[in-house]
Regions:
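C-terminal or mid-to-C-terminal helical accessory/interaction module adjacent to the motor/catalytic core
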Residues: 87, 100, 140-227, 268-269
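Short strand-coil-strand connectors
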Residues: 30-32, 226-230, 414-418, 665
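Conserved short loop/turn motifs at secondary-structure junctions
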Residues: 1, 109-111, 188-191, 268-277, ...
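Intrinsically disordered, low-complexity regulatory segments
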Residues: 1-169, 173, 471
């Protein structure tokens, strides 16, 4: 028997139908000599610090550097502790039993870094030694599965891919766990999350926000003139920018005194616009955010759904090109789109046209080619799924269409010693722009009459126009994805920039999750389409902006090294040692940092140790030093103590009279709270001596 393991049940069902495994069992399908089973995402992951004997947040534990990482089943939180997910444990037992019985394994998890890691972690956790081969396909159509099964690849070919994925996973653990604990300890106020990619991304958002808000606009003035010829009116702006209205007005008077505009020059040229490349995941996410207002995470989810519905190729691709053999399939995909009403006419016209070969380059195809529609027409898509499908289909038609040809005209006019310019454009051949029929964005090109050098035109109107300089815009998800993708190009150090010029931070598959993490941590929020930091996010940024943890250059360099591990050009063990040194450095930096975040607005020193701060939480207030152990429960006698009451209690030893406590019988009473010598909390009744009572008891 051969076992095929897919990444999720829906994919396993599609593979099972192709190989004839139709008998359903608990956790797998069987038949025709196959057992087709599945994971559901990461069944196995890296153990948390508690597994290595490091409980709580303690300075003396840091940095936590396990000699060997332990693998554990995926865990769920129950109360204050994490336990193995029962469903995951059951499926792992199914996999153990199947692996024990089988002759060999066919790995059919997603053909990428994370898919490889999902299988290898399970394989290693179960201690399996059975031989395995790889099903490496770029779509889930029956045709692709059959072809992939005929061309199974040796599992060892993907050892470097696994080592890269493993190195990334361990680096994220080392940096994330240690930096988060270090900053939380330094803050003495709650728990703060940092990460290898998360924190530089937050820094990008915050630095742009600060730059935008601190920008001081500068006013300037231009002169606008209007003229007409052959019934076509047009306007032009002065090339000169005036710093003040008085000077601009003086220039305007000189222009008006002449009453005529002279055509100084007319330059005409033919402009050829190549079609855009096919989408990779990041390009799709950027355009879907700009045109549909979809988040990066939503776009990935929709693309994954279309992939599993067999109408889209593998979505987590970082390539915008296809290979020669895939190019041979493009005519049939174009023919298929003739059956799709929106694209029928364009597809029919393109079928009889030589296809543009710009997206065809074997050398630029990574693990997977660019996003394409498959040979299956979609049915029953949701409105959002249809929108993403149509974007990919339209881009396929655009990418293989002829280029767009325009005649560009630039005219210079003169009057009163000032030069005025205007640009015009006439489309001679729409080419790829005919697919969606959309005009160019952010391009102002007027329709101009036929103008000749040295001719003069009457000045019809003139005025001064007030303008002002503009800051860089706040980041949107689209612009942030671009910044994450191309940050290596922005590096100031020339030698370093050359070394990592194409490096970004994160990968196409992980960038959406990084952005969502920043939302989940309450570090950023949406303001319409813009991403803006919260007070908490800015406080974290101000603390780490000059630290290694926020260094975009360093993070981009790590990404470059991880890519080299995948190709065998770098050593995973050396990378691990470098990350451990880096982790120790950021821990030292963060432990000495000061983070000014006090969500409750109240701060006070612990009355017991008299050194650390009191942390305020929903149900308790406690000392930041876990060794001190001072804890005060907010619920006392049926009342929830406010931050102000707690501060008064721990700083003066008692509160004012509080009304409305209730005893065990439900009767109401009034009392002040007092802090006893053993640091428990008791009641002090009016005109009576204090009565000690443990803070967990009610009276």
């Amino acid at each position: 028997m051969k076992v095929i393991i897919a990444e999720k049940p829906s994919v396993a069902q599609g593979i099972a139908s192709v190989v004839g495994a139709r008998q359903r069992k608990d956790g797998y399908l069987t038949g025709n000599g196959y057992a087709v089973t599945w994971a559901f995402g990461h069944l196995v992951g890296l153990a948390m610090p508690e597994s290595y004997g490091f409980s709580g947040f303690r300075r003396e534990h840091l940095p936590i550097l396990p000699q060997e990482f332990r693998l554990v089943p995926r865990q769920v939180r129950e109360g204050k502790v994490y336990k193995d997910d029962p469903g995951v444990v059951r499926q792992l037992e199914v996999l153990r039993e199947l692996f024990d019985r089988c002759e060999s394994i066919i790995v059919a998890t997603d053909a990428g870094r994370e898919g490889e890691l999902i299988f290898r972690y399970v394989y290693n956790y179960l201690g399996c030694t059975k031989p395995f081969v790889r099903l490496w396909i770029s779509s889930l159509t029956d045709k692709a599965i059959r072809e992939g099964l005929r061309n199974l690849r040796e599992g060892s070919l993907y050892d470097n891919l696994y080592l890269s994925a493993k190195a990334r996973s361990e680096a994220d653990w080392l940096v994330g766990i240690n930096s988060s604990q270090a900053l939380s300890l330094a803050a003495g106020q709650g728990v703060f999350s940092l990460g290898r990619v998360q924190t530089p991304t937050l820094a990008m958002i915050c630095s742009r926000y600060r730059e935008n808000k601190q920008f001081v606009p500068r006013k300037y003035f231009q002169i606008k003139v209007s003229a007409a010829k052959d019934g076509i009116a047009f306007s032009a702006l002065s090339r000169n920018r005036f710093d003040d209205l008085e000077t601009a007005t003086a220039g305007l008077r000189e222009v008006e005194d002449g009453g005529m505009l002279a055509v100084s020059s007319v330059e005409r040229r033919e402009a050829v616009q190549e079609p855009p490349l096919l989408y990779d995941l990041t390009a799709l996410q950027k355009e879907a955010n700009g045109k549909l207002d979809f988040s990066a995470d939503k776009t990935l989810t929709l693309a994954q759904s279309l992939y599993e519905k067999k109408v889209l190729s593998y979505p987590r691709t970082g390539s915008r090109y296809i290979s020669e053999d895939v190019f041979e399939e493009i005519p049939s995909r174009i023919t298929l789109l003739q059956q799709y009403p929106r694209f029928a006419a364009i597809a029919s016209a393109l079928r009889d046209t030589p296809l543009n070969r710009r997206p065809v380059d074997d050398a630029k195809v990574t693990d997977h080619h660019a996003l394409l529609v498959t040979e299956n027409l979609p049915e029953g898509l949701s409105q959002d799924e249809q929108a993403i499908y149509e974007m990919v289909a339209a881009r396929l038609l655009e990418a293989f269409s002829p280029h767009c040809v325009k005649e560009m005209t630039e005219v210079a006019l003169s009057a009163g010693g000032e030069i005025f310019t205007i640009k015009g454009a006439v489309v001679k051949s729409a080419g790829w722009r005919a697919v969606r029929g959309e005009p160019e964005e952010e391009v102002e090109e007027a329709t101009l009459p036929e103008l000749q050098t040295d001719e003069t035109l009457p000045l019809l109107a003139s005025e001064t126009v007030e303008k002002q300089t503009k800051p860089k815009p706040l980041h949107t998800e689209s612009s942030l994805l671009s910044a994450m993708e191309h940050c290596g190009r922005e590096i100031g150090d020339g030698q370093l920039r050359t070394a990592i010029r194409e490096a970004g931070i994160g990968t196409p598959a992980t960038r959406a999750a990084v952005i969502e993490t920043l939302f989940a941590r309450n570090y950023i929020r949406r303001d319409k389409k813009n991403l803006v930091p919260t007070e908490k996010g800015l406080a974290v940024y101000d603390t780490v902006k000059d630290k290694k943890i926020a260094d975009v250059e360093m993070t981009a360099a790590w990404e470059e090294t991880l890519a080299k591990i995948e190709t065998g050009e770098a050593d995973a063990s050396s990378f691990r040692r470098d990350i451990e040194v880096y982790t120790a450095q950021i821990v030292a930096e963060l432990l000495s940092a000061t983070l000014d975040v006090a969500p409750s607005g109240e701060q006070c020193t612990c009355p017991k140790c008299k050194k650390s701060r009191i942390l305020f939480f929903d149900k308790v207030a406690k000392c930041a030093d876990v060794d001190c152990g001072f804890t005060l429960f907010r619920n006392k006698g049926g009342k929830v103590l406010t931050d102000k009451l707690i501060v008064g209690l721990v700083t003066t030893g008692r509160t004012p009279l509080v009304k409305g406590f209730r005893n065990r019988e439900g009767r109401s009473f009034d009392a002040a709270l007092v802090l006893n010598p053993d640091f428990t909390v008791g009641y002090s009744f009016p005109d009576r001596k204090p009565q000690g009572e443990k803070s967990g008891r009610k009276r």
